[in-house]
Amino acid sequence: MRIFATEVQTINSFVRLESFKEVYGLIWEFLPIFSLVLGILTGVLVLVWLEREISARIQQRIGPEYAGALGILQALADGIKLLFKENLRPSIGNTTLFSIGPSIAVISILLSYSVIPFSNHLVLADFNIGIFLWIAISSIAPIGLLMSGYGSNNKYSFLGGLRAAAQSISYEIPLTLCLLSISLLSNSLSTVDIVEAQSKYGFWGWNLWRQPIGFIIFLISSLAECERLPFDLPEAEEELVAGYQTEYSGIKFGLFYVASYLNLLISSLFVTVLYLGGWNISIPYISILELFERDQIFGTTIGIFITLAKTYLFLFISITTRWTLPRLRIDQLLNFGWKFLLPISLGNLLLTTSFQVFSL
C-alpha cells in the first residue's frame, strides 16, 4: 500500500508540473500582447499630456501642473474620474447599439497596432497583407460611431455619426491609393518589408522623398480619419454639441476619448513606417541591423526610440495644426476629398505604376 501511495503522489506531482508548464506557456504567449497594450496606453498618456502642454504654450497659458510632476498624470486622473462617474443611458433609444458602439471603436483601432514594427524583429504579427489589414480593421471604427449616434436617439448624435461615416469613406479611398503606391515601390504589402526596402538607400531612400505627393495626401487623409481639426466635423461643438458623444458619460465617454488618441497614434506610427524609414537611422555607417546583431537588447531599444521619436514629430505637427487652421464646412470637406485628393492620389498611383513598369 505504501508503494501504491508513493506512485500516486509521483503521478500527481507530474500532473501538477505539466499543468504548471501549460499555464506558464499560456502566460508566455499572451505576454507580448499585454506588453503591447501597456506600451500603447502609456503612449496615449504621454500624447494627452503633450497636447495639453503644447496647446497651453501656443495659447500662452499654463497647462496641467498639479497631477504629478509637470502635470504628466493629468490624463490618468481624468480617466479615474470618468471611471467613477455615473454611466447614463438614453430613456428612448437602442441601448444595445448605444452600449457596444464605443467598444467597437476602441477594439478595431487596438487591433491595428498588431502590424506595426517598432524595431527589427519587434512586431506582433508580420502579415503579408499588413497594410491592407490595417485598412480593413480601421474601416470598422466608423461603424461603431454610426451605431452610437443612431442608438442615442438624438439628432445631434445621429448627425455626428453620419458625418463620421461620410468623412471616413471620403478620405479612406485616397489613403488606400497612397498605400498601393507604397506597396508598388516596395514590392510588398508587409510593413516590415516596406521599412527594410527604405533602408537600402539611407536617408534619401525614405518614401518621403520617393513619394512626396503621396506623403502629403496620406498626411491630410490621416488627419481626416482621426477627426482632428480642421476635419473635426463629426463632433463640431458649435454645430452638434459633441456629435455622436453627446449622450455619453462616464467610462463610455472615456472610451471615445481614448479611441481618438489611439487613432491619432496609430496614424502617426504608419506615417513613420511607410514614409520615414521606420526604425532605421539616417546616420552614415550606423545600421540598426548591425547594432541588433551585436547586441539584440541595445539594437531593439535604439530602434524603438527612433520609431517613437519620428512618431511624436508627426504628432507635434498634428497638435499645432489643431490651433492653426479653421474648421471646414461639411460640403467643403467632402468636395476636398472627392474632387481634389481622390484624382491626385489616383494620378500618383498611375505615375508610380508607370515608373515601376518601365524600370523593369
From Swiss-Prot:
Topological category with respect to the lipid bilayer: Multi-pass membrane protein
Domain of life of the native organism: Eukaryota
GO cellular component: chloroplast thylakoid membrane
EC number: 7.1.1.-
Cross-referenced PROSITE patterns: COMPLEX1_ND1_1, COMPLEX1_ND1_2
GO annotation, biological process: aerobic respiration; photosynthesis, light reaction
Catalysed reactions, as listed in the record: a plastoquinone + NADH + (n+1) H(+)(in) = a plastoquinol + NAD(+) + n H(+)(out); a plastoquinone + NADPH + (n+1) H(+)(in) = a plastoquinol + NADP(+) + n H(+)(out)
Annotated protein name in UniProt: NAD(P)H-quinone oxidoreductase subunit 1, chloroplastic
Role of this protein: NDH shuttles electrons from NAD(P)H:plastoquinone, via FMN and iron-sulfur (Fe-S) centers, to quinones in the photosynthetic chain and possibly in a chloroplast respiratory chain. The immediate electron acceptor for the enzyme in this species is believed to be plastoquinone. Couples the redox reaction to proton translocation, and thus conserves the redox energy in a proton gradient.
InterPro entries linked: NADH_UbQ_OxRdtase_su1/FPO, NADH_UbQ_OxRdtase_su1_CS
Record's subcellular location: Plastid, Chloroplast thylakoid membrane
Keywords: Chloroplast, Membrane, NAD, NADP, Plastid, Plastoquinone, Quinone, Thylakoid, Translocase, Transmembrane, Transmembrane helix
Subcellular location, principal: plastid
First and last residue of the signal peptide: none
Entry GO MF terms: NADH dehydrogenase activity; oxidoreductase activity, acting on NAD(P)H, quinone or similar compound as acceptor; quinone binding
Family listed: Belongs to the complex I subunit 1 family.
Matching PANTHER family: NADH DEHYDROGENASE SUBUNIT 1, NADH-UBIQUINONE OXIDOREDUCTASE CHAIN 1
Self-association and partners: NDH is composed of at least 16 different subunits, 5 of which are encoded in the nucleus.
Transmembrane segments: 30-50, 98-118, 127-147, 165-185, 203-223, 248-268, 297-317, 340-360
Annotated source species: Aethionema grandiflorum
